[in-house]
């Protein structure tokens, strides 16, 4: 049992709620005093607390009991900046609302709420996005528009987040960065309140090892549970993988993927197990994505025992995802001018170019039941020499509008697949080597007549 609440002593201090004033200093003082005294639990009395960035220390549990709501300040100057990693590159960025940085054996727990009130940052991003796209700067707007994360765990170990609700984050919900032995248990994440929040991922596991995510319910506007390891030249420089991740007993609602690997793949992603999961309205059950300048390998991904409904794909795999975001090109009018450091980082080429070619291999998806799927599968390598390798999909039942496509693969295997689809719809196959594409008992709708093998 790695729970940091064990053996840490009694409640250290109670803070009285007052939402009309900024409580950051008072809460932080209680956390710091608790840590100096050898650790323990900081308890907040029921009520609303307005706060800026808080920093949890080693040996401390911040307890958010039922009836406690932390209201994040909407003013970005209440979040001091420091060097971190954002969307795959290291740069200066505002602190999160709750931060656990360079600490051990710390936690946040309870049945309370962290309301990040992030709409001010959503609106800021959408306005900047319009301006930047018109200038050919889509690739950098996500980095120029600084927004506040909900929770950051960075360079820390033996950390637990348990039981509370996280909502309306200005940027990513919970980022686990350069850390190990972290547990996320029973969080409810809801970023679909009061607007469309860009980049409001639920949980991001970023160049970290030995991570458990369980019993979580994630409703967001980007990847629900996402696994990352840096991007492009900067990610290849850092070269730290994410590995040994277990995701179980979770529900993904609106979002881009129940489990997503990428698009930041530079340090590699390996040894991921997901089971007993549910997808309700998210875009993909499993999404793998990268780009031709990311590099790294996604491998040894296992996903089983999944129920899905109203999803776009059961599997989506793309080596060349979202080019307008993935590739950085400086418009001519900026040439020769002074540009920010993070622009230079993004514009640094990967040399030799082959170092940036990503690999996806050894992926296993089984025991999936899916209803109302737009397209069963969309899996595409890049060319003859850069294929998706060793994919195994089996024991899957899906009702789908379109079977989908499989292109540029090697040893791609589908067996015991039952699709309910229109007879005229056939799966598109192109440039696949040593593959076994076999749909058994494929049926048509609405009368469910056996249609045979849909591959051609």
Task: For each feature predicted by the language model, list its residue ranges.
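Surface-exposed acidic, glycine/proline-enriched linker/cap segments
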Residues: 79-98, 125-148, 329-355
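Acidic Gly/Asp/Thr-rich repetitive segments characteristic of extracellular carbohydrate-active
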Residues: 14-43
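Single conserved hydrophobic/aromatic residue that forms the stacking wall/gate
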Residues: 1-12
């Amino acid at each position: 049992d790695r729970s940091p609440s064990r053996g840490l002593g009694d409640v250290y201090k109670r803070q009285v709620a007052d939402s009309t004033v900024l409580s950051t200093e008072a809460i932080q003082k209680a956390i710091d005093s608790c840590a100096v005294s050898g650790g323990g639990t900081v308890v907040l009395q029921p009520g609303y607390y307005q706060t800026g960035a808080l920093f949890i220390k080693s040996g401390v549990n911040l307890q958010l009991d039922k009836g406690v709501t932390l209201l994040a300040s909407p003013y970005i100057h209440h979040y001091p900046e420091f060097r971190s990693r954002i969307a795959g590159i290291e740069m200066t960025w505002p602190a999160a609302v709750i931060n656990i940085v360079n600490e051990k054996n710390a936690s946040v727990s309870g049945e309370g709420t962290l309301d990040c009130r992030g709409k001010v940052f959503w609106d800021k991003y959408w306005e900047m996005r319009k301006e930047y796209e018109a200038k050919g700067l889509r690739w950098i707007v996500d980095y120029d528009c600084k927004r506040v994360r909900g929770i950051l765990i960075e360079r820390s170990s033996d950390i637990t987040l348990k039981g509370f609700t996280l909502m309306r984050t200005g940027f990513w919900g919970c980022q686990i960065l350069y850390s190990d032995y972290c547990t996320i248990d029973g969080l409810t994440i809801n970023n679909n309140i009061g607007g469309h929040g860009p980049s409001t991922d639920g949980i991001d596991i970023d160049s970290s090892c030995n991570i458990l995510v369980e019993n979580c319910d994630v409703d967001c506007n980007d990847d629900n549970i996402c696994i990352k390891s840096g991007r492009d030249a900067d990610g290849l420089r850092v070269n730290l993988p994410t590995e040994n991740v277990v995701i179980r007993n979770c529900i993904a609602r609106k979002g881009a993927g129940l489990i997503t690997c990428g698009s930041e793949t530079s340090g590699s992603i390996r040894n991921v197990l997901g089971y007993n999961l549910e997808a309700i309205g998210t875009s993909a059950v499993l999404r793998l994505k990268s780009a031709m300048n990311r590099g790294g390998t996604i491998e040894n991904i296992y996903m089983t025992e999944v129920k899905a409904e109203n999803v776009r794909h059961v599997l989506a795999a793309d080596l060349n995802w979202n080019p307008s975001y993935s590739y950085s090109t400086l418009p001519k009018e900026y040439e020769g001018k002074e540009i920010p450091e993070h622009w230079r980082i993004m514009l640094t080429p990967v040399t030799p170019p082959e170092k940036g070619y990503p690999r996806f291999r050894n992926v296993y998806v089984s025991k999936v039941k899916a209803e109302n799927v737009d397209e069963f599968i969309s899996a595409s390598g890049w060319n003859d020499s850069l294929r998706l390798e060793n994919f195994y999909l089996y024991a899957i039942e899906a009702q789908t509008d379109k079977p989908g496509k499989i292109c540029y693969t090697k040893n791609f295997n589908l067996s015991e697949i039952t699709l309910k689809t229109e007879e005229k719809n056939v799966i598109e196959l192109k440039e696949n080597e040593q593959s076994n594409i076999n749909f058994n008992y494929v049926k048509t709708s609405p009368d469910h007549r056996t249609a045979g093998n849909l591959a051609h």
